[in-house]
UniProtKB/Swiss-Prot annotation:
It is an enzyme of class 2 (transferase). InterPro entries: Aminotransferase_I/II_large (IPR004839), Asp_trans (IPR000796), NHTrfase_class1_PyrdxlP-BS (IPR004838), PyrdxlP-dep_Trfase (IPR015424), PyrdxlP-dep_Trfase_major (IPR015421), PyrdxlP-dep_Trfase_small (IPR015422). The modification N6-succinyllysine is found at K318. The modification Phosphoserine is found at S149. Belongs to the class-I pyridoxal-phosphate-dependent aminotransferase family. The gene is Got1. Expressed in neurons of the retina. Localizes to the inner and outer plexiform layers, the inner and outer nuclear layer and the outer segments of photoreceptors. It is found in: Cytoplasm. L-aspartate binds at G39, W141, N195, R387. GO terms for biological process: 2-oxoglutarate metabolic process; aspartate biosynthetic process; aspartate catabolic process; aspartate metabolic process; cellular response to insulin stimulus; cellular response to mechanical stimulus; fatty acid homeostasis; gluconeogenesis. It catalyses: L-aspartate + 2-oxoglutarate = oxaloacetate + L-glutamate; L-cysteine + 2-oxoglutarate = 2-oxo-3-sulfanylpropanoate + L-glutamate; (2S)-2-aminobutanoate + 2-oxoglutarate = 2-oxobutanoate + L-glutamate; 3-sulfino-L-alanine + 2-oxoglutarate = 3-sulfinopyruvate + L-glutamate. Homodimer. This is Aspartate aminotransferase, cytoplasmic. In eukaryotes there are cytoplasmic, mitochondrial and chloroplastic isozymes.
Length: 413
């Protein structure tokens, strides 16, 4: 008799919530259905948008007979890495001028986080420091916890961020957690357009955060998934990172080009490393090269070529900034329209937070039972946390969504 399958005892893993939501939406035959869960940009026709500048560059690449399919270097396409780091740190960055910046091309922002996490677990402030506390905001993007856990970190803690009552930043709680964290702890910070709350510190608040972090020797690991997409202004969205660098911090920054280039399935990311001197950055990169070699070995070329070609050409760069602003402006419009409708309906509660938050997501303040009502009764799909993607709203479904939220809030406590 043959033995049972060696996989017989493997338990079924729960589905990834945001992708299950999209699958449920797709299978729903109801014509009223609205998907507010998807983590990607949509046009006013609810369609994905390929940026015109990306189409143009793809055509140029297709017609360039000098290009081939040879392996890229382990750390990635050199032009892409330097352009990506320059985009986040700025053209006049002192750190770049002093050659103490490095980049690692990664498989999206998640890949950048994972390479950074693996490196920190092995080499941060000594060797094999997986007991170093990792602090992530409460709430945060669910993958932050998962990535650092998978990298072997044993002590992952939340820090205060969201004040549910006032629907804004809990600055005092945040500062208290910084003060009480063990020295040399690692803090994962959202550079802009905080996911899921859409609430960012102001520049003055960032200065207070940086001052405590510097005094307590805390290490900033920025996640920058939305540069340009948050406010429509590339410089403004990178302000926090640039300020930390100007204050002399060593830091990591995981960058994603999924949202601001619309290159979701090309997996284009970069891990920017800022050190105190060029020698240490070179040593860091040498160790990251070893980590990449056993992770994906060599990154893909197409997305990196598109980004590098766009960022290095003044005309294409200008066109790209216009494309990004188109996306950011549509989101801002949807925010103000949704708020106006809820206020016109006299929906209980305050709704000013919808326009005060920025980026793709809004933390509505809806509770899980109200969300359940919207999903089951109204066929409006959103996460149990009440997070909605503003891009799921269109001029055609705004009224329906607003009246449905009004019903949920008035009927269900």
């Amino acid at each position: 008799m043959a033995p049972p399958s060696v996989f017989a005892q493997v338990p079924q893993a729960p589905p990834v919530l945001v992708f299950k939501l999209t699958a449920d939406f797709r299978d729903d035959p109801d014509p009223r259905k609205v998907n507010l869960g998807v983590g990607a940009y949509r046009t006013d026709e609810s369609q994905p948008w390929v940026l015109p500048v990306v189409r143009k560059v793809e055509q140029k690449i297709a017609n360039d007979n000098s290009l081939n399919h040879e392996y890229l270097p382990i750390l990635g396409l050199a032009e892409f890495r330097s352009c990506a780091s320059r985009l986040v740190l700025g053209d006049n960055s002192l750190a770049i001028r002093e050659n103490r910046v490095g980049g690692v091309q990664s498989l999206g922002g998640t890949g950048a986080l994972r390479i950074g996490a693996d490196f920190l677990g092995r080499w941060y402030n000594g060797t094999d420091n997986k007991n170093t506390p990792i602090y992530v905001s409460s709430p945060t993007w669910e993958n932050h916890n998962a990535v650092f856990s998978a990298a072997g970190f044993k002590d992952i803690r939340p820090y205060c961020y969201w004040d549910a009552e006032k629907r804004g930043l809990d600055l005092q709680g945040f500062l208290n957690d910084l003060e009480n964290a063990p020295e040399f702890s690692i803090f994962v910070l959202h550079a802009c357009a905080h996911n899921p709350t859409g609430t960012d510190p102001t520049p003055e608040q960032w200065k207070q955060i940086a001052a405590v972090m510097q005094r307590r020797f805390l290490f900033p690991f920025f996640d920058s998934a939305y540069q340009g997409f948050a406010s429509g202004d590339l410089e403004k969205d990178a302000w926090a990172i640039r300020y930390f660098v100007s204050e002399g911090f060593e830091l990591f920054c995981a960058q994603s080009f999924s949202k601001n280039f619309g290159l979701y399935n090309e997996r284009v990311g970069n891990l920017t490393v800022v050190g105190k001197e060029s020698d240490s950055v070179l040593r860091v990169l040498s160790q990251m090269e070893k980590i990449v070699r056993i992770t994906w070995s060599n990154p893909p070329a197409q997305g990196a070529r598109i980004v590098a070609a766009t960022l290095s050409d003044p005309e294409l760069f200008k066109e790209w900034k216009g494309n990004v602003k188109t996306m950011a402006d549509r989101i801002l419009t949807m925010r103000s329209e949704l708020r106006a409708r809820l206020e016109a309906l006299k929906t209980p509660g305050t709704w000013s937070h919808i326009t005060e938050q920025i980026g793709m997501f809004s933390f509505t303040g809806l509770n899980p039972k109200q969300v359940e009502y919207l999903v089951n009764e109204k066929h409006i799909y959103l996460l149990p946390s009440g997070r909605i993607n503003m891009c799921g709203l269109t001029t055609k479904n705004l009224d329906y969504v607003a009246t449905s939220i009004h019903e949920a809030v008035t009927k269900i406590q």
